[in-house]
């Protein structure tokens, strides 16, 4: 949350919609950021598609994610993604092409990537979203993944 708070303090106008769970240790911080207009907490949602549909970008930093469904879903809906340069996340995002990769555990790196997004013009954001969608079709379609898995396992 520190990167978002710093951007807000630096005068950038945005609201992060928080969808899903977070640890209890963040409760007070989220409530404070919500009162400042930095975030809006929605909790767990059975149907996340409406949130992707209204998002300009999806921010999903992680220390240990594996293959992130959030990144895949966001990209499939044509949204640029800001995520961490770790195994699993880096496979779904091409840095500065379909989104941005930040350094793990680096508030400054996440800040810089979020700032880069906010300073990117809308037409370029839309192009990045289209590239993200196409990457999902070309590399992560279920038939492709199953065929690649069968080949890898030599079944």
Which role fits each region the language model picked out?
Residues 68-71, 89:
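Short glycine/serine-rich donor-binding loops of glycosyltransferases
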Residues 44, 63:
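Aromatic "clamp/platform" in nucleotide-sugar-dependent glycosyltransferases that forms part
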Residues 116, 123-139, 145-151:
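A short, well-ordered alpha-helix in the C-terminal region of glycosyltransferases
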Residues 58-59, 74:
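A short hydrophobic beta-strand element within the catalytic core of glycosyltransferases
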Residues 80-83, 93:
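Short hydrophobic beta-strand element within catalytic cores of glycosyltransferases
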Residues 6, 10-38, 42:
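Short, structured helix-loop element that forms part of the nucleotide-activated donor/catalytic region
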Residues 46-55, 76, 90, 94:
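Short acidic alpha-helix that forms the nucleotide-activated donor recognition element
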Residues 95-96, 100-107, 116-122:
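Conserved acidic donor-binding segment of nucleotide-sugar-dependent glycosyltransferases
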């Amino acid at each position: 949350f520190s990167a978002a708070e710093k951007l807000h303090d630096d005068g950038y106008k945005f609201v992060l919609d928080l969808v899903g769970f977070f640890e209890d240790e963040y409760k007070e911080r989220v409530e404070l950021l919500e009162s400042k207009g930095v975030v809006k907490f929605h909790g767990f949602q059975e149907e996340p598609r409406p949130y992707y549909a209204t998002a300009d970008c999806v921010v999903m930093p992680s220390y240990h994610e594996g293959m992130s469904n959030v990144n895949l879903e966001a990209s499939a809906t044509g949204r640029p993604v800001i995520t961490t340069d770790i195994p699993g996340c880096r496979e779904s995002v091409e840095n500065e092409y379909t989104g941005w990769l930040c350094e793990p555990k680096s508030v400054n790196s996440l800040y810089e990537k979020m700032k880069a997004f906010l300073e990117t013009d809308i037409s370029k954001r839309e192009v990045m979203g289209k590239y993200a969608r196409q990457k999902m079709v070309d590399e992560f379609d279920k038939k492709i993944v199953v065929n690649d898995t069968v080949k890898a396992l030599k079944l």
